[in-house]
UniProtKB/Swiss-Prot annotation:
This is Manganese peroxidase 1. GO terms for biological process: cellular response to oxidative stress; hydrogen peroxide catabolic process; lignin catabolic process; response to reactive oxygen species. The active site is at residue 67. Induction: During wound-healing and by factors which induce suberization. Belongs to the peroxidase family. Ligninase subfamily. Its EC number is 1.11.1.13. Catalyzes the oxidation of Mn(2+) to Mn(3+). The latter, acting as a diffusible redox mediator, is capable of oxidizing a variety of lignin compounds. The gene is MNP1.
Amino acid sequence: MAFKSLIAFVALAAAVRAAPTAVCPDGTRVSHAACCAFIPLAQDLQETIFQNECGEDAHEVIRLTFHDAIAISRSQGPKAGGGADGSMLLFPTVEPNFSANNGIDDSVNNLIPFMQKHNTISAADLVQFAGAVALSNCPGAPRLEFLAGRPNKTIAAVDGLIPEPQDSVTKILQRFEDAGGFTPFEVVSLLASHSVARADKVDQTIDAAPFDSTPFTFDTQVFLEVLLKGVGFPGSANNTGEVASPLPLGSGSDTGEMRLQSDFALAHDPRTACIWQGFVNEQAFMAASFRAAMSKLAVLGHNRNSLIDCSDVVPVPKPATGQPAMFPASTGPQDLELSCPSERFPTLTTQPGASQSLIAHCPDGSMSCPGVQFNGPA
């Protein structure tokens, strides 16, 4: 696939970093003195919120990076929003109350204290850097580019700029194009984030419903499992933005898998189906594609040439598990619903077991893993 050759070139170019030119107070050598402030911030985020895990608190901050950045519109102009500008944190009683941001108040309230503690760092930089640190805890994730120097925004974004799971593919693609000229390939690439994501508000009867069977690992399972025949719902049925899932079984806090209507639609639309299918069992390709698309998303509203490359202070992510994509137990090739005849589907094995396995609620496999939740204005 031509996309894969292009992404491989981009990944190689991104690996070439400038030689360190500054020494931070802790002795770390970095490419620019301005990057030093992010070293204690990363440590603070890990110790206070993430605990070095790809858990719910990390998932929520990764979601925040997208919701903060996509709030920009080329057609509506500057009054609509400033993109990756930290406005979620700066206007916590405004944007978190938009329906598309339902549930984002947790991550907003968790990050607000860091604005005071690390007050040389803008809210805009805090959001994107926190997301990069959060993602580094997810095995298989790429090390994201991080550019520092975004100024804070002085106005909140308007409502209606965040894509929602009930939106049509046409509306989603138009929104991304209007936000920053994103291509369908880049849109699907960004949805690799759903491999480490869960939903709390789509179905109000359940919490932390994962989008694939491995929600604590950045892998291609989500691209496989969205292509499997839906058989039920993890909670109640007929929720806006949700369609039947192939793995709805849950027990206690181990919630069954949820399938978003928008993911299902993108996996089958002629404009995006082959892109979606092409990520199945292509871990390195998916990770590199996501990194490239995130590099574009994270600077919406800014001139990247005016920012400082501080990628060298982003923690090195945990390595991939090495586990290939597999059909979950109780499913197999007979359950595939494919919409791309031109993309060869890989030969995959099936996990052992005659019935669906429960999806663990916590990274360590347990049912109880209390998260961090600060009180705040959002």
